[in-house]
């Protein structure tokens, strides 16, 4: 099963910069168990609209069956890990 973490961000978003190191650590520690797709909402407004992103940062964990979890605002590593496990990573 493919597990994806979509990271909706903007270059001007301070909290997004706070979230980045957490996601980088997760990627390193979890290796190939999931993939991260970074979505710059200023450049990819259609994707942001499709996922109804209204605040930043927004993280969406999904698998082949659809969206498993959505987080708005800076999210703790443990919460993201729980969602990744629930999604099958």
Segments (PLM) and residue ranges:
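The canonical Cys-X-X-Cys-His
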Residues: 13-16, 59
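Non-catalytic, surface beta->alpha helical segment in thiol-disulfide oxidoreductase systems
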Residues: 60-89
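Structural micro-motif
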Residues: 52-60
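Hydrophobic/aromatic anchor residues within beta-strands of the central parallel beta-sheet
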Residues: 34-36
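Structural microenvironment flanking redox-active thiols in thiol-disulfide oxidoreductases
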Residues: 41-47
């Amino acid at each position: 099963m493919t597990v994806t973490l979509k990271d909706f961000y903007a270059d001007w978003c301070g909290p997004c910069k706070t979230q980045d190191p957490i996601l980088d650590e997760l990627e390193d520690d979890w290796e190939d168990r999931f993939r991260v797709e970074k979505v710059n909402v200023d450049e990819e407004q259609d994707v942001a609209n499709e996922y109804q992103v209204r605040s930043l940062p927004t993280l969406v964990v999904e698998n082949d069956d659809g969206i498993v979890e959505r987080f708005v605002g800076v999210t703790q590593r443990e919460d993201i890990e729980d969602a990744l496990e629930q999604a099958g990573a």
